[in-house]
Amino acid sequence: MPILSKASYLFTTFITVASLNIQAQNPSENLPVPLNEAQITARFAELALECVHKEYPNIIKHMMRSDDDVQTPKLLYPAFYGCFDWHSSVHGHWLLSRIAHMHPETVHFERIINSLDKSFSEANLAGELAYFERSDTGTSFERPYGLAWFLQLTSELREWDHPKAKEWLAILHPLENKIIANISDWLPKLSFPIRGGEHSQTAFAFGLMLDFSEAANNRSFKALVETTVLRLYENDINCPLAYEPSGQDF
């Protein structure tokens, strides 16, 4: 390290330590009181509970071939219409499942159970599956980000020892199978990785897919994802870190 840089580092460290010491000796009455874990967990639960069944505002990706195809988000996606878009709704439901699983003592536990029960009805998931079976948009819909988060959701339900989790997982299972089939059909056709810092980035999605393959003990899907990861990334060298960050990163 150059002398100037080292000196600057030592000076910055000294100022930081001194500032902390002054604050310790003269605590300000205006400093916010840190939230504890239960309060933070409750706040995250509240954010998800407020949005999973809030239909608008909303942005949808939906191909329309005629006036008959014009539909509201709730009609298009009966289970995952809230939280502004499909994938945000999915990981909002994952968040609720995760909180109820890991923190059953949360004050919002019953609200979470009721909210998930409202979303994960057989009728709602039949509607979701019908959308994925559309030949025009269903095969590429929410690929890969939303699909990976859906698999993370079902992974959470598998790991949660609660009667409702097992019930919901059974209802979600047909859509899970369809999503696995769509991904499995797509991966061999993917010639290059998607490296941008947005939802389409493949490395992040592959990580969630591998998590799912472990939770579901789906060896064939795991092998396919691992083969794809090696094919697309194994020979990567000299990653241009100087190009980061990008103005389009999410």
Where are these regions (language model features)?
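Loop-centered beta-sheet repeat module
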Residues: 179-249
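Extended ligand-binding groove/face enriched in aromatic
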Residues: 75-78, 82, 90, 97-209
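Bacterial N-terminal signal peptides that target proteins for export
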Residues: 1-10
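Metallocofactor- and cofactor-centric catalytic cores in central/energy metabolism, strongly enriched
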Residues: 87
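Low-complexity, Ser/Thr/Pro/Gly-enriched N-terminal "stalk/linker" regions
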Residues: 26-81
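Boundary at the C-terminal end of the N-terminal hydrophobic targeting segment
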Residues: 22-24
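Bacterial N-terminal signal peptides
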Residues: 9-19
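Positions within ordered alpha-helical repeat solenoids
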Residues: 50, 54, 98-101, 156-159, ...
